[in-house]
Amino acid sequence: AGAAEMWVKYLGGKAQEELKGTAVNGDPGVAEAVRQDKFGIGYNNVGFAYDPATGKPIEGLAIVPLDTNGDGTISADENFYGTRDEFTAAVAAGKYPFPPARVLYLVTKGEPNATIADFYRWVLTDGQQYVQPAGYVALTQDRIDEALAALPGSK
């Protein structure tokens, strides 16, 4: 499920089709539609809400915080939206709810062949350098070790 599907589940719905509003194509479309409409609101993946160069919200977008404890205010421990790094650290620490946050997986039909297993190894090792700059939460070393051990050809 994508960002819109997770958002509708957070709001208590079941399917993306329940969302009403202007249809747009993909994450860049959501960001641009909101930027162009002073009353626009959208839900988007982190990599399209924060500027990759500065880590700050993209010009023309405001990141609206969630009152996760339901007390009617954004308390200090809920105010982690200033930069992409602050936000992803809060997600990693479990301060941002699931959904709308979600775990992403790599899957194959059946056991991965040697080429795919090598790709998974790269993702779990050298590829990890690209995770945080792209706006994702890095895996813990324990999760990486567990996944590597499960790959075919691992000792």
Task: Put a short name on every predicted segment.
Residues 1-155:
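Exported/periplasmic ABC-transporter solute-binding proteins
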